From Swiss-Prot:
Record has DNA damage as a keyword: no
Protein name: ATP synthase epsilon chain
Family (UniProt): Belongs to the ATPase epsilon chain family.
Membrane topology: Peripheral membrane protein
GO CC list: plasma membrane; proton-transporting ATP synthase complex
NCBIfam families noted in UniProt: ATP_synt_epsi, PRK00571.1-4
Entry function: Produces ATP from ADP in the presence of a proton gradient across the membrane.
Chief place of localization: membrane
Assigned keywords, A-Z: ATP synthesis, Cell inner membrane, Cell membrane, CF(1), Hydrogen ion transport, Ion transport, Membrane, Transport
Subunit structure of this chain's protein: F-type ATPases have 2 components, CF(1) - the catalytic core - and CF(0) - the membrane proton channel. CF(1) has five subunits: alpha(3), beta(3), gamma(1), delta(1), epsilon(1). CF(0) has three main subunits: a, b and c.
Length: 140
């Protein structure tokens, strides 16, 4: 029997994934993190990007886009508390591309009454969504 861990991915709106997994990869604040069962306890912030979950007994990995959040790792439990989370199959490329364009325009428009940090965060999130869509396509 393979070693597994419980993985929960939740956002403020809903639980996106809950189940047993053999491996989780996600974008940590300092770079890509790979988590296996028995990992040392860890709490860290996560950047916008794709969470890849190797689900026990499934040939295909699960993908979830997160727009940042917190990761908590215990030896046999991984919890992702995401600001926003979207299942890989629910990502909308046209919507993400439009959000990217709007954020870029807001950053260029000096007369705009926008919060610069907010526009940068929206741009980073849109770029990460588009990258997650590309990764998902490559796996198919």
């Amino acid at each position: 029997m393979a070693h597994t861990m419980r993985v929960d991915v939740v956002s403020a709106e809903e639980e996106i994934f809950s189940g047993e997994a053999e491996f989780v990869a996600l974008p940590g604040e300092s770079g890509e993190l790979g988590i296996l069962p028995g990992h040392t306890p860890l709490i860290t912030r996560i950047r916008p990007g794709a969470v890849r979950i190797k689900v026990t007994g499934q040939a295909e990995d699960e993908f979830v886009f997160v727009a940042g959040g917190i990761l908590e790792v215990q030896p046999h439990v991984v919890t992702v508390l995401a600001d926003t989370a979207i299942r890989g199959g629910d990502l909308d490329e046209a919507k993400a591309a439009e959000a990217k364009q709007l954020a870029e325009e807001a950053l260029v428009n000096k007369e705009s009454k926008i919060d610069y940090a907010q526009a940068q965060a929206e741009l980073a999130s849109a770029i990460a969504q588009l990258a997650a869509i590309q990764r998902l396509r490559q796996k198919r």
